[in-house]
UniProtKB/Swiss-Prot annotation:
PANTHER family: 3-OXOACYL-[ACYL-CARRIER-PROTEIN] SYNTHASE, BETA-KETOACYL-[ACYL-CARRIER-PROTEIN] SYNTHASE III, CHLOROPLASTIC. It catalyses: malonyl-[ACP] + acetyl-CoA + H(+) = 3-oxobutanoyl-[ACP] + CO2 + CoA. Residues 252-256 are annotated as: ACP-binding. It is an enzyme of class 2 (transferase). It comes from Bartonella tribocorum (strain CIP 105476 / IBS 506). Catalyzes the condensation reaction of fatty acid synthesis by the addition to an acyl acceptor of two carbons from malonyl-ACP. Catalyzes the first condensation reaction which initiates fatty acid synthesis and may therefore play a role in governing the total rate of fatty acid production. Possesses both acetoacetyl-ACP synthase and acetyl transacylase activities. Its substrate specificity determines the biosynthesis of branched-chain and/or straight-chain of fatty acids. Disulfide bonds: none annotated. This is Beta-ketoacyl-[acyl-carrier-protein] synthase III. InterPro entries: ACP_syn_III_C, ACP_syn_III_N, FabH, Thiolase-like. It is found in: Cytoplasm. Pathway: Lipid metabolism; fatty acid biosynthesis. The gene is fabH. Its EC number is 2.3.1.180. The keyword GTP-binding does not apply.
């Protein structure tokens, strides 16, 4: 049986960090107000020379080094982003070129904050059917470009960044208890909630980019239930439950949502990876940034059972269960 394993991970952040106190100098807010409601202390903001593509390239290079591979070993690049460098071609193709890859194929996936989960699941499907041997999966976003910096309910939440993972096909023998890699994945979407979290513009409507708009309370109201339901489905598909979990790596949107979801799933706080305090919500980069952090600091070890999850505009949401 073919399983998809994550052979290497990497991340990249812009050079400039922006603390809550610095933000309060030009936005009507305060460190206390932001921390109490979100758990965020700072975020990273891209400068004019830092883009979704440039951050994605750096994260990809770090993941390749971590995996002990070169770009010649990669068959496909999948980029999850909602903030591409251009309307077209795909930013994944720009990353492919920047990495010196002129073989295989590359494309973008747009599922907002759920993007990395959707991209990783797509890559897993390619590996299982034999369409590729190794895939570079990247989540990269520069949400600072689409924020209304006069709207304190949204501009305090988001940051820029990128994360990447090298997904590799591996032949596995034995039952699920002896297997590693992606054990199960579940994806969901429902367009009935489009107006809860969106960008008010686009090439086909306004011919402009627009700004991010969000009904925060409404998103929170739905988020916890949707996240926990899809996580439970993911556990069930693998014949497991939350009591067996070693690490919960959620989308870093808001500390309140993370804590409420973990509590409902009966996952103790010491098993939850939280980086939202340092990065803010980096959209598609959120999960791979958190995963890379927990791997680099030694928390996640070989054999650990890990649940990744995310929810984003649309709504889109999903979860992936992995044996490391």
């Amino acid at each position: 049986m073919i399983r998809s394993i994550i052979r290497g991970v990497g991340s990249a952040l812009p050079k400039r960090s922006l603390s809550n106190d610095e933000l309060a100098k030009f936005v009507e807010t305060s460190d206390a107000w932001i921390v109490q409601r979100t758990g965020i202390h700072q975020r990273y903001i891209a400068n004019e020379n830092e883009t979704t593509v440039s951050l994605g390239v750096k994260a990809a290079q770090a993941a390749l080094i971590n995996a002990g591979l070169t770009i010649k070993d990669i068959d496909c690049i999948i980029l999850a982003t909602s903030t591409p460098n251009r309307t077209f071609p795909a930013s994944a193709v720009e990353i492919q070129y920047a990495l010196g890859m002129n073989h295989g194929f590359a494309f973008d996936i747009q599922a907002v904050c759920s993007g990395f989960i959707f991209a990783l699941t797509t890559g897993d499907s390619y590996l299982r059917c034999g369409a590729a041997k190794r895939i570079l999966v990247i989540g990269s976003d520069t949400f600072s470009r689409i924020l209304d910096w006069e709207d304190r309910t949204t501009c305090v939440l988001f940051g820029d960044g990128a994360g990447a993972a090298v997904l590799e096909a591996e032949e596995i023998e034995g039952g699920i208890a002896f297997q590693r890699g992606i054990l199960s994945a579940k994806l969901r979407s429902d367009g009935a909630y489009i107006d809860k979290l969106y960008v008010d513009g686009g090439p086909s409507t306004t011919q402009t980019t627009g700004y991010l708009r969000m009904e925060g309370r409404e998103v929170f109201k739905y988020a916890v239930g949707m996240i926990t339901d899809v996580v439970d489905d993911c556990f069930a598909a693998a014949g497991m439950d939350s009591s067996q979990l070693d690490w919960f790596v959620p989308h870093q949107a808001n500390k309140r949502i993370i804590e409420a979801s973990a509590k409902k799933l009966k996952i103790s706080s010491d098993k939850v990876v939280i980086t939202v305090d340092k990065h803010g919500n980096t959209s598609a980069a959120s999960v791979p940034l958190a995963l890379t952090t927990a791997l680099c600091d030694g928390r996640i070890k070989r054999g650990d059972l890990i649940m990744l999850e995310a929810m984003g505009g649309g709504f889109t949401w999903g979860a992936i269960l992995i044996r490391w």
